[in-house]
Every structure is written in C-alpha cells, then in structure tokens.
C-alpha cells in the first residue's frame, strides 16, 4: 500500500494516517522527519540538506525527491508507505512522477473550511497538564477554566482564527491544486496513475476511518 494523504490543516490527517499505517504495517513519512533523519544519519544527501538549511535556505525539490527515493528503498517500506504532507506543490508531484515513484492511491480527506475553522479555533488547553478542551465539542465545566485546577485555559497561536485562515489560504494556493492534478491523471492515464479517492472528513473518527478503509479497498 503506497499512498499519499491529502487534506487541509485540521482535516484530521494525522489521526487517520496513524490508523492506516498500523492497519497496513507501513511507515508514515513526512518530509520534516525524513530530513531530520538524513541529517542525523549523516548520509551524503543529509549533509547536502544540512548545508542548505544551515544557510537559511529552502531545500530544493530535487534534493527532496532524492531523499524520498532513498527513504522508500529502506526495508520498512517493503510493504509500502504513507506520505503525509508531501508532495505539497505541483512541481514536487511532477518531480515524483519523473523519478518513477510508484503510488497505489491518493486519498483526500475533504472537510469544508468553515468546519475546520470551527474545529481549530475552538480548541483550548491547560498548558501545565496538557489537558485539551473545545468550546463547542468538549467544553470545560466552567467556561475558560481547567476542570481540575480551575486555572485559565489558553488558545494556542496556531489555533487563532486569523492564523487558521492564513494556513488554509496557503493550502488553497499551493496544495489544493494537487487534488485536480491527481484526479485528472487518474482519469487520463489509469494504467500508470494512482487511484484517486476522496472521503468526507466530518463525523466521528471511527466513521472517517471506515470511509478511508472502504476507499482504499476499491
């Protein structure tokens, strides 16, 4: 099972990725983890990436693709892999295709943006304990206070509505076009293209997982 998981920030990709990886016995690969591992291992590509990052520059798509090819050749990828948050752009997708990276599925978790904004901007946390709440879906007993200590809850910077909207805009501009890229490739070249599947990402975690498994068996 070789797949790409697509979806906006806050669509619940992380939860579903963990379940899919466990179910199929495959590793979850993100470019961040991959870069850190290559740098730590001191591989030639890792050293190249480190030099670029130390200079405060972005790692090129070519280097990322070479790291991807190196990573998926490792023994734990024998049964497949799940790419989370990669590719992010059309040039990266083109580079993957040109490099001959074979994929079985592209699975999109589709959640309306207003639902994501409500989901993320409603989160509150108690930093000292790590307890989390949601103003609508899992509210504290007393508004704005931790259930156990009564201390004030905070909203993380990442969860502020303005920040969420900015991240969704970046997703719309850069990554959302991949949905059209993979769905049209699947229609025009079904023999070589990965199967493109989209599922609704609203409802309970169990419902979404069931939709994902059904999509990946069709």
From Swiss-Prot:
- Which GO terms label this protein's molecular function in UniProt? adenylate kinase activity; ATP binding
LID: where is this region? 122-159
Q: What class of enzyme is it?
A: transferase
GO CC, sorted alphabetically, is: cytoplasm
Which InterPro entries does UniProt cross-reference here?
Answer: Adenyl_kin_sub (IPR006259), Adenylat/UMP-CMP_kin (IPR000850), Adenylat_kinase_CS (IPR033690), Adenylate_kinase_lid-dom (IPR007862), P-loop_NTPase (IPR027417)
Region NMP: start and end of each range? Answer: 30-59
Q: Which residues bind ATP?
A: 10-15, 123, 132-133, 203
Do the record's keywords include ATP-binding? Answer: yes
Top-rank taxon of the source lineage equals: Bacteria
Q: Which UniProt keywords apply?
A: ATP-binding, Cytoplasm, Kinase, Nucleotide biosynthesis, Nucleotide-binding, Transferase
- Location of region: Disordered: 127-150
Sequence positions that bind AMP: 31, 36, 57-59, 85-88, 92, 156, 167
Q: Where in the cell is it found?
A: Cytoplasm
Sorted alphabetically, which Gene3D superfamilies does this protein's record hold?
A: P-loop containing nucleotide triphosphate hydrolases
EC number of the protein:
2.7.4.3
A Gene Ontology BP annotation from the UniProt entry: AMP salvage
Q: Which reaction does it catalyse?
A: AMP + ATP = 2 ADP
NCBIfam families in the cross-refs? adk, PRK00279.1-1, PRK00279.1-2, PRK00279.1-3, PRK14527.1
User: How is the subunit organization of this protein annotated in UniProt?
Assistant: Monomer.
**Domain remark from Swiss-Prot or TrEMBL:** Consists of three domains, a large central CORE domain and two small peripheral domains, NMPbind and LID, which undergo movements during catalysis. The LID domain closes over the site of phosphoryl transfer upon ATP binding. Assembling and dissambling the active center during each catalytic cycle provides an effective means to prevent ATP hydrolysis.
Q: What does this protein do?
A: Catalyzes the reversible transfer of the terminal phosphate group between ATP and AMP. Plays an important role in cellular energy homeostasis and in adenine nucleotide metabolism.
- Give the family per the record: Belongs to the adenylate kinase family.
The entry's protein name is: Adenylate kinase
Q: What gene name is listed for this protein?
A: adk
């Amino acid at each position: 099972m070789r797949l790409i998981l697509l979806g906006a920030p806050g669509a619940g990709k992380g939860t579903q990725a963990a379940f899919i990886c466990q179910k199929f016995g495959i590793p979850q690969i993100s470019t961040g983890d991959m870069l850190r591992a290559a740098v730590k291992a001191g591989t030639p590509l890792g050293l190249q990436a480190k030099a670029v990052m130390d200079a405060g520059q972005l790692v090129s798509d070519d280097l990322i693709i070479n790291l991807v090819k190196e990573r998926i050749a490792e023994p734990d990828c024998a049964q497949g892999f799940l790419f989370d948050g990669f590719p992010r752009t059309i040039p990266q997708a083109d580079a993957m295709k040109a490099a001959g990276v074979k994929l079985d599925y592209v699975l999109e978790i589709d959640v309306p943006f207003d639902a994501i904004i409500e989901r993320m901007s409603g989160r509150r946390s108690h930093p000292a304990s790590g307890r989390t709440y949601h103003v609508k879906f899992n509210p504290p007993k007393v508004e704005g206070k931790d259930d156990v200590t009564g201390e004030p809850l905070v909203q993380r910077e990442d969860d502020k509505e303005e920040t969420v909207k900015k991240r969704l805009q970046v997703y719309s501009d850069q990554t959302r076009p991949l949905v059209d890229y993979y769905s049209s490739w699947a229609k025009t070249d079904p023999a070589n293209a990965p199967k493109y599947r989209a599922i609704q990402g609203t409802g309970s975690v169990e419902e979404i997982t069931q939709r994902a498994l059904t999509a990946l068996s069709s």
